[in-house]
């Protein structure tokens, strides 16, 4: 797999709580220059970012982030607001308290409500795999499939661990047809990126891959 093909799977991400507009601009410029799938940024920057890229790049943002335990109504509002401001893709965090209570029906209904507001915009569902048992992850693969969401996503990048090869393998085995996989958190090398893609991920959430590619380009004058 060529580097350009890897870059097409990347949601180039900056979700730091202290992210400044110049830092967001750099993310947007790099994402456009390297033709990544999207730039994933805080919701407060979506409107300004959408105006800045002027249709040249998909803008992704997060809702219910990073803990997921805001109410469904709050998440629905966040979704509507983000789309109104120009977001093309939404990454939502599920309520893990519902998961731990065994209330998967409530998790599914919340995703359905948010997907209804997304309409033709892409919805990715963050399940925070580092906090799940294997059995919970398998159950959530079914929940996300039935909900109509477009992607199941491993991690926020703000919890105890990010994506693992094992979790992506489980997702690839148990998620239904039509649901794609996004691996996110801790992807720090091109080799890891290739492995995640080989295991079934079609999106990668990372802030590091472009830095690596830039370093390689400096050495070889190409990527």
Curated annotation (Swiss-Prot):
What pathway or pathways are given for this protein in its record? Carbohydrate degradation; 2-deoxy-D-ribose 1-phosphate degradation; D-glyceraldehyde 3-phosphate and acetaldehyde from 2-deoxy-alpha-D-ribose 1-phosphate: step 2/2
List this protein's GO terms for biological process. 2-deoxyribose 1-phosphate catabolic process; carbohydrate catabolic process; deoxyribonucleotide catabolic process
Instruction: Kindly list the GO CC terms recorded for this protein.
Output: cytoplasm
Per the Swiss-Prot or TrEMBL record, the active site comprises 91, 153, 182
Recite the UniProt keywords alphabetically: Cytoplasm, Lyase, Schiff base
Where is it localised? Cytoplasm
Q: Listed GO molecular functions?
A: deoxyribose-phosphate aldolase activity
Enzyme Commission number, as recorded? 4.1.2.4
* Major enzyme class: lyase
Reactions catalysed, as given in the entry: 2-deoxy-D-ribose 5-phosphate = D-glyceraldehyde 3-phosphate + acetaldehyde
Q: Which family does it belong to?
A: Belongs to the DeoC/FbaB aldolase family. DeoC type 1 subfamily.
Protein function: Catalyzes a reversible aldol reaction between acetaldehyde and D-glyceraldehyde 3-phosphate to generate 2-deoxy-D-ribose 5-phosphate.
Q: Write down what this protein is called.
A: Deoxyribose-phosphate aldolase
């Amino acid at each position: 797999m060529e580097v350009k093909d890897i870059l097409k799977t990347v949601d180039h991400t900056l979700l730091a709580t202290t992210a400044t507009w110049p830092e967001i601009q750099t993310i947007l410029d790099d994402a456009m220059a390297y033709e990544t799938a999207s730039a994933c940024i805080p919701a407060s920057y979506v409107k300004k970012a959408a105006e800045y890229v002027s249709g040249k790049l998909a803008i992704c943002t997060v809702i219910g982030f990073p803990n997921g335990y805001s109410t469904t109504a709050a998440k629905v509002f966040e979704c509507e607001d983000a789309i109104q401001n120009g977001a093309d893709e939404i990454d939502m965090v599920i309520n893990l308290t519902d998961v731990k209570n065994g209330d998967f029906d409530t998790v599914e209904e919340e995703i359905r409500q948010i997907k209804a507001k997304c309409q033709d915009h892409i919805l990715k569902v963050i399940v925070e795999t580092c906090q799940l048992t294997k059995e919970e992850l398998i159950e959530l693969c079914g929940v996300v499939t039935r909900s109509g969401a477009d992607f199941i996503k491993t991690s926020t990048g703000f919890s105890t661990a990010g994506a693992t090869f094992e979790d992506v393998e489980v997702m690839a085995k148990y998620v239904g047809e039509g649901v794609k996989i996004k691996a996110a958190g801790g992807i720090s090398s091109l080799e890891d990126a290739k492995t995640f893609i080989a295991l079934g991920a079609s999106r990668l959430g990372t802030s590091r891959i472009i830095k690596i590619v830039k370093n390689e380009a400096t050495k070889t004058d190409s990527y």
